[in-house]
């Protein structure tokens, strides 16, 4: 190890801790001011146009209802068109002036291009792109008999949002709009039996962190970290996993989560953790990852 690295190894931790001790009070005060300002100057989405992927159930469905209550025009995207029609009907009753339903798979490039184009053709603009579509599977990595079986998870959770974002950016720049990425605390720290899901969400988080810098100030980026949410998933392995976690934390309804998320988006937050205690997992994984390590049980 050369002398420069030795010096950095000694000095940087000391300087960093000292800086944080001085900076943190100012940071907390600044965030408090931002919160107060956000409450007073919350974005009004009445008359704005919003695309929501994965909106046939779970958080995506209730995000659609929340935007509808606030008077937004909606494009709902998912693979189950029959369910989308049901959600769309309720959105109209809740106050959305018009709702477009587009059957599509976000892991398919041409589908992403199509639902963005159809939105512009119908509404003439785009203000919010909500990348919510995602899939999960509770499985030990070594239990995959075919490694290609992991591709649907990665393609939907990471590449899907990337594709949709690529086609949406030119339109979002015109309206100074926002990109919303529904990620997961699993992207911060490892979750046993969900290695591929966690990796796809970690990639998603880092992509949008970088994109926020590249697009600032023309387009805003909000990354969402939902906790344990009741989303109607019927996968038995995922239900068992959720049941294990529910012994430790409370499962929040998708409706409550969606309301908090849209509030955060409209206040211009860069991150929305719901419930808010979820952000503690980030600090634990960064400062003391040993606390999050436990031997997973095999069924």
UniProtKB/Swiss-Prot annotation:
Protein name: 11-beta-hydroxysteroid dehydrogenase-like 4A
Keywords: Lipid biosynthesis, Lipid metabolism, Membrane, NADP, Oxidoreductase, Signal-anchor, Steroid biosynthesis, Transmembrane, Transmembrane helix
Gene Ontology biological-process entries: steroid biosynthetic process
Domain of life: Eukaryota
EC number: 1.1.1.-
GO CC list: membrane
Chief place of localization: membrane
Residues that coordinate or bind NADP(+): 54-80, 105, 197-201
Binding residues for substrate: 184
Transmembrane segments: 10-30
Membrane topology: Single-pass type II membrane protein
Similarity comment text for this entry: Belongs to the short-chain dehydrogenases/reductases (SDR) family.
Keyword Transmembrane: yes
């Amino acid at each position: 190890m050369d002398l420069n690295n030795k010096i950095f190894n000694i000095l940087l931790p000391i300087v960093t801790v000292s800086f944080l001790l001085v900076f943190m009070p100012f940071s907390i005060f600044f965030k408090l001011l931002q919160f107060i300002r956000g409450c007073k100057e919350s974005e009004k989405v009445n008359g704005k146009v919003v695309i929501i992927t994965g909106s046939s159930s779970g958080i995506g469905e209730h995000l659609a209802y929340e935007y509808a209550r606030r008077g937004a025009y909606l494009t709902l995207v998912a693979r189950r068109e029959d369910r989308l029609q049901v959600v769309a009907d309720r959105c109209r009753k809740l106050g959305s002036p018009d709702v477009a339903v587009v059957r599509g798979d976000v892991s398919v490039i041409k589908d992403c291009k199509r639902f963005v184009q159809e939105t512009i053709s119908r509404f003439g603009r785009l203000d919010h792109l909500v990348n919510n579509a995602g899939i999960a599977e509770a499985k030990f990595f070594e239990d995959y008999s075919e490694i290609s079986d992991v591709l649907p998870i990665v393609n939907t959770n990471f590449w899907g949002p990337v594709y949709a974002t690529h086609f949406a950016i030119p339109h979002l720049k015109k309206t100074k709009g926002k990109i919303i990425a529904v990620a997961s605390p699993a992207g911060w720290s490892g979750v046993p039996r969900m290695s591929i899901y966690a990796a796809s969400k970690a990639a998603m988080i880092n992509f949008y962190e970088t994109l926020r810098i590249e697009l600032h100030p023309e387009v805003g980026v909000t990354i969402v970290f939902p906790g344990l949410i009741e989303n109607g998933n019927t996968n038995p392995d995922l239900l068992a996993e959720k049941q294990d976690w529910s012994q430790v934390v409370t499962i929040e309804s998708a409706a409550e989560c969606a309301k908090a998320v849209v509030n955060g988006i409209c206040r211009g937050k860069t991150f929305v953790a719901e419930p808010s205690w979820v952000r503690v997992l980030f600090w634990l994984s960064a400062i003391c990852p040993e606390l999050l390590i436990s031997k997973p049980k095999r069924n």
